[in-house]
Amino acid sequence: MARTLYDKVLEDHIIDRQEYGTCLIYIDRHLVHEVTSPQAFEGLRNAGRPVRRPDCTLATVDHNIPTSPRRNFKDIATFIKEGDSSTQCETLGENIEAFGLTYFGMEDSRQGIVHVIGPEQGFTLPGTTVVCGDSHTSTHGAFGALAFGIGTSEVEHVLATQTLLQKKSKNMRIRVEGKPSAGVTSKDIALHVIGVIGTAGGTGCVIEFCGEANESLSMESRMSICNMSIEAGARAGMIAPDDITFEYLCNKPLASKGEEWDRAVAYWKTLKFDADAQYDITVDIKASDIAPTVTWGTSPQDVAPITGKTPDLDSIADPLRRLAVQRALDYIGIASNTPLEGVKIDKVFIGSCTNSRIEDLGPAAAIVKGKRVADWVDAMVVPGSALVKRQAERKGLDKIFQEAGFNWREAGCSMCLGMNPDQLKPGERCASTSNRNFKGRQGAGGRTHLLSPAMAAAAGIKGCLTDVRHMEVAGIALTGNESPRQEVVASKYDGSPEVFKSTQDTTPAVKPPQPASDSSSSGGMPAFTTLKGYAAPLDISNIDTDMIIPKQFLKTIKRTGLGSALFYSLRFDPQTGAENPAFVLKERTFRQARILVCTGPNFGCGSSREHAPWAFNDFGIRCILAPSFADIFFNNCFKNGMLPIVLPQAQLEAIAAEAQKGVEVEVDLVQQIVRNPGGEVSFDVEEFRKHCLVNGLDDIGLTMQKADKIAQFETKRTQTWPWLDGKGYKGKATKIEINGGQQKKAKLDW
């Protein structure tokens, strides 16, 4: 049977096919950061479980850390001034030490954004399964990997078992034919695609990008496209590996060498779709139709060419769509039918896991060389990793940016999501190379326009959104694959180990388990059979996770206490904290709501933060009814004993109308019926998920019953794909030898 790329990679990782179509799959690579991991490690500790495969796990700090100079860095406690941010970062370090994992901390010469360091180290490889508690894990699909974001419960599941329970997604192909026009980058392609299919267009799918425009891209450009696939609603995005991929990986620190490398490449060359493979959805786009693109609203699907205008409200027939556009324009502060070129900006941000690599910085530097940013603009460049930063500095890019008036920063997520000191002030408008333009994403009241690095650089010089094709471009020498080996002088704080080196003691140093607590342990959930109570009606489309729980509330190491943060920017004034009595959850009846009825589609789009269902649970809402859900949020609900129900629009509107009267609604999971005074409505739910909810079952405990099958798969994996095992792996958990912070005078030998 002909297979797609996704089919091939998925099938090579199936350990056990279970009833109801669920599969237990093996995870090859796990990336960990400070925001979505504390509760997972605490769950392991409470259950007395070790990390199964430390050799397949790599951790770093990126979201919370300041990107200010680190010349005087001593330790996290003194460097990070925000207490909750410092706590998360210190907690990660403690967990790394306790469980014996490889860690690129702030004192390490290889620290950076998780989705930058994985590829540049060769940790990401073709044909692998890659996960991280971060939605933009889709980035790694550029290598032909099946890479997707997961919530904290699944982070714990992977740490404990190196597996996940998954149901096969649909196959979607996006084919971009022809060569891109001058000034058009992979970021423009990605934004254009999202504009065509919408932020829910890829829901339930794994997207395979192909066609001349995609296949001719460099690896770093491919990463940008796959990074943005989550913004199209997809579970993952993939591009088949080829000679461009192999050249990029050759000699990377963690890539195989010699005969093992040849064997790996031979396998990787089989990872492409068969000629007669069938796709559930195919979208064809002409590259010639794509221009330099910019967002105008508060969703990545709100896009237009730089030569275009904001939507004309009078021409939108659908009243719900017109209302959504009006809300977006009101927030972004631009009138209907306004030309995008010439919109004045206040800040420029070049960085994020989407666009912070050397190929992103080079074209931006070429735009600004010999020029100055507009007087009223604050501009910053944040390299994606310490290695990218040093590579750029060797090329003199830092000097070019600084002479043009840009602030040259240290590596980190920075202004992408405003969990650190790099934030927009209320009303400030930013030309940003990041991936989301949600309300308040870069700072409360901040306004974000997504675009390419070259377009962002041009906006900084002109002081407004501008067409990069009208800018003079300086010549800067940038060759293709320059990053496999980085000769970096180690600092006194550099704890650079021989990565994945095994020691005599192969047992992770797990701290003694503590008694399990309801707030931390994942050793079971409250059973969900029936739920009766008030149902709060909500008529908003594309409710994103930033709206559900803003980024400032993610700085916690517990699962509880987040109910007060639920829909914070809608329930309260973000600046004063005053209540908004007009919001539904502030109405007396719905303060006690146990069910939410949303009549707008694509509920829960955005990040993988499991803090969103935690906030609902803490508030008291355990069931959400909506026309459709974003994949990761949908999955996270079940992991937390919540029931997301998909119903047709007409039925939802009828239930919402009854709920508005203040009557109670009952959800009967056993019978799969929603009851309200207006009648009964049946709903569908996957049998396995229903079984787990009704019985309050723990996924990890269920998976542990498959220990023999997991071990058998690992034996096969070592024999068939030996390059996937960490160095020193001999069938046991491999403890990593950390240098311990001793000063190393010699250059690092990668």
Swiss-Prot record:
Amino acids binding [4Fe-4S] cluster: C353, C413, C416
Region spans: Disordered: 492-524
Molecular functions per Gene Ontology: 3-isopropylmalate dehydratase activity; 4 iron, 4 sulfur cluster binding; metal ion binding
Enzyme class: lyase
Pfam families hit by this protein: Aconitase (PF00330), Aconitase_C (PF00694)
Pathway participation: Amino-acid biosynthesis; L-leucine biosynthesis; L-leucine from 3-methyl-2-oxobutanoate: step 2/4
Cofactor: [4Fe-4S] cluster
EC number(s) recorded for this UniProt protein: 4.2.1.33
The keyword 4Fe-4S is assigned to this record: yes
Annotated PROSITE patterns: ACONITASE_1, ACONITASE_2
Presence of keyword Isomerase: no
Coiled coil region boundaries: none
GO biological process terms on file: L-leucine biosynthetic process
UniProt catalytic activity: (2R,3S)-3-isopropylmalate = (2S)-2-isopropylmalate
This protein's GO CC annotations: 3-isopropylmalate dehydratase complex
Family matches, as CDD domains: IPMI, IPMI_Swivel
The record's free-text note on cofactor binding: Binds 1 [4Fe-4S] cluster per subunit.
Gene3D superfamilies: Aconitase, domain 3 (3.30.499.10), Aconitase, domain 4 (3.20.19.10)
Assigned keywords, A-Z: 4Fe-4S, Amino-acid biosynthesis, Branched-chain amino acid biosynthesis, Iron, Iron-sulfur, Leucine biosynthesis, Lyase, Metal-binding
Subunit structure, as described in the record: Monomer.
Function (record text): Catalyzes the isomerization between 2-isopropylmalate and 3-isopropylmalate, via the formation of 2-isopropylmaleate.
Family: Belongs to the aconitase/IPM isomerase family.
HAMAP family hit by this protein: LeuC_type1, LeuD_type1
Stated name of the protein: 3-isopropylmalate dehydratase
Species the sequence originates in: Rhizopus niveus
Species lineage: Eukaryota, Fungi, Fungi incertae sedis, Mucoromycota, Mucoromycotina
